[in-house]
Amino acid sequence: MKTYNVAIVGASGAVGQELIKGLENSFFPIKKFVPLASARSAGKKIRAFNKDYEILETTHEVFEKEEIDIAFFSAGGSVSEEFAISASKTALVIDNTSFFRLNKDVPLVVPEINAQEIFNAPLNIIANPNCSTIQMTQILNPLHLHFKIKSVIVSTYQAVSGAGNKGIESLKNELKTALEHLEKDPAIDLNQVLQAGAFAYPIAFNAIAHIDTFKENGYTKEELKMVHETHKIMGVDFPISATCVRVPVLRSHSESLSIAFEKEFDLKEVYEVLKNAPSVVVCDDPSHNLYPTPLKASHTDSVFIGRLRKDLFDKKTLHGFCVADQLRVGAATNALKIALHYIKNA
């Protein structure tokens, strides 16, 4: 079996760490592993494959020098903008950032939906979609193929780790501060003691309807990503409206979906379609309190869907609630599936 020299740009970050775990657990045919990061992190040690590796600085020359075959980028859009083209001259680049996603020469891939696009990459770069988009499309695509979707309204409840390690630390620190003050005074106004960390407002005991920057039309970039990326991945143009909210959950994103079909549908057929969809787990028995939760979805590679029900007033509309680990399903696992499909079929 052929083996590959693999680099991870942003190896010490939240997604980078999940990529390492995924590479270890998938028995990926690695010949050499090269962790890369900024000059600030270069020289530090990182644990992978039961040994310590020295992090190298990300430069334009390092990919050719280290003879990298596959490079995963998970260090932010500005890093991908600066270095991905250089890396793609000698390596297949799988980019976890938003920088290349809507580039017409870069395929945007969810392998369960459009794996064939992996081999339509003239720049030798493949984009990994937004985490919220990945889990949503894995529900929408099988339903669209069977019923034909007319429109979608989605509201997200996104974990702090979607903002990286700084998001995790903000929640931990703010919870500690809040609980210390609540212990002394249960009626205290937390607005007086909490300060914003990684987000626009304190995230502890809060919900913030603001992910990424606001655009002139009132939507955030995160909300528009879900619209435009879904259209590109699925090859559709039906209306999608998204509202994205950050919640004080450590890991796994949740989404409330309202899906309008072109015709009336049989709910039993919906269950059958989703039960047979790849990477989807139907978790739906309200009589036994069985429905998806972020805690249950964490550290798994499935998209969980439940609370499936017809709209009370519109027989063509389906409601549901889906949850997935955004660091795995929404980033690392999807990127690894792209790489595995590539080496299996190249």
Curated annotation (Swiss-Prot):
Coiled coil (residue ranges) = none
> Which terms under GO biological process does the entry name?
'de novo' L-methionine biosynthetic process; diaminopimelate biosynthetic process; isoleucine biosynthetic process; lysine biosynthetic process via diaminopimelate; threonine biosynthetic process
Q: Which residues bind NADP(+)?
A: 12-15, 40-41, 161-162, 326
Task: Tell me the domain of life.
Answer: Bacteria
Active-site feature positions: 131, 253
Q: Where does substrate bind?
A: 158, 246
Per its UniProt record, what Gene3D superfamilies does this chain match? Dihydrodipicolinate Reductase, domain 2, NAD(P)-binding Rossmann-like Domain
Q: Per UniProt, which keywords does this protein have? A: Amino-acid biosynthesis, Diaminopimelate biosynthesis, Lysine biosynthesis, Methionine biosynthesis, NADP, Oxidoreductase, Threonine biosynthesis
The Gene Ontology terms for molecular function here are: aspartate-semialdehyde dehydrogenase activity; NAD binding; NADP binding; protein dimerization activity
Q: Which pathway does this polypeptide act in?
A: Amino-acid biosynthesis; L-lysine biosynthesis via DAP pathway; (S)-tetrahydrodipicolinate from L-aspartate: step 2/4; Amino-acid biosynthesis; L-methionine biosynthesis via de novo pathway; L-homoserine from L-aspartate: step 2/3; Amino-acid biosynthesis; L-threonine biosynthesis; L-threonine from L-aspartate: step 2/5
Its Enzyme Commission number(s) read 1.2.1.11
Per the record, what are the reactions this protein catalyses?
L-aspartate 4-semialdehyde + phosphate + NADP(+) = 4-phospho-L-aspartate + NADPH + H(+)
Which positions bind phosphate? 101, 225
The job of this chain, per UniProt, is described as: Catalyzes the NADPH-dependent formation of L-aspartate-semialdehyde (L-ASA) by the reductive dephosphorylation of L-aspartyl-4-phosphate.
Which family does the record assign? Belongs to the aspartate-semialdehyde dehydrogenase family.
Complex formation: Homodimer.
Entry's PANTHER family? ASPARTATE-SEMIALDEHYDE DEHYDROGENASE, DEHYDROGENASE, PUTATIVE-RELATED
Task: Check the record and name the NCBIfam families matching this protein.
Answer: asd_B (TIGR01296), PRK14874.1 (NF011456)
Protein name according to UniProt: Aspartate-semialdehyde dehydrogenase
